[in-house]
Amino acid sequence: FPELCHGCGGCLLACEEDALVEVEREIGTIRRGAGFMDGVLDVGEAKAPPLIEGLLREVAADPGQEGALVLIDAPPGTSCSAVAVVRGADYVILVTEPTPFGLHDLKLAVGMCQALDRPVGVVINRCDIGDQETASWLRGASIPILEEVPFLPEVAAAYANGELAAKSVPTLSASLARVARAITEWQ
C-alpha cells in the first residue's frame, strides 16, 4: 500500500519482527532557481510531507542560506503538509479572514503551532469584510496582529491583468512592507 505511506518511519518502529524494509521511491522533484526553491509533487502522489521535508533539508544545507531570512509558503490548515512546514519553522505567519470560518480555522492553526512550540504572528486579510471577533480573540490570546489588510479590488484586477499585485497596488505593497518589518524585528 505505497499510497498510504507518509514516509514517517512509524511502521518500522512498530514492527517488532523487523519484517519491514524501507524503500526509496520518487514522489516529486525539488527545483532550484535564483533565490527560490520549490517542491513539485508528482501527479497521483497524495503525500507531500516527505517532499516538504526534503526541501527543508536542502534549504538548511544550502550555504547561501546561512543567516538568511527564508520564507516558506505552507498549505492552509492543519494537514500533515502544514505540520511538516511548521515543524521546521522558526516563526509562523498565519493569514486569516475575519469571518466565523476564518476564526475557527485560525484557532486550529494556532493550536497546532502552540503544540509544536512555534511563535506565531497573524495577518488579517480583507479585514473590513467581517466583524472584530478575530482581532478580539487574537488580542485576548496575546498573539500579535502583524497587519490588517483591507479588501482591495485592485488586487483582483492586477491578477486578472497578469501583474504582480505586490508591485502594482501601493496599499498592498505598504502592508507587505510592514509585515516584512515585523519579521525582521522578530529576528
Regions found by a protein language model. Give the residues of each.
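Iron-sulfur cluster-binding cysteine motifs and their immediate structural context
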Residues: F1, H6, G10-E26
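Conserved active-site and cofactor/substrate-binding residues in soluble primary-metabolism enzymes
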Residues: H6, V43-P50, H104, K167-A174
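Conserved Radical SAM active-site core
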Residues: E24-D38
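Switch II (G3) loop of P-loop NTPases
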Residues: D38-K47, G54-A82
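Short, surface-exposed connector motifs at secondary-structure boundaries
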Residues: E66, A89-I93, Q114-G121
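Structural beta-sheet core signal
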Residues: I72, L94, V122-I124
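Inter-motif core of Ras-like GTPase G domains
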Residues: S79-P100, L106
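C-terminal lobe/tail of nucleotide-utilizing enzymes
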Residues: M112-Q187
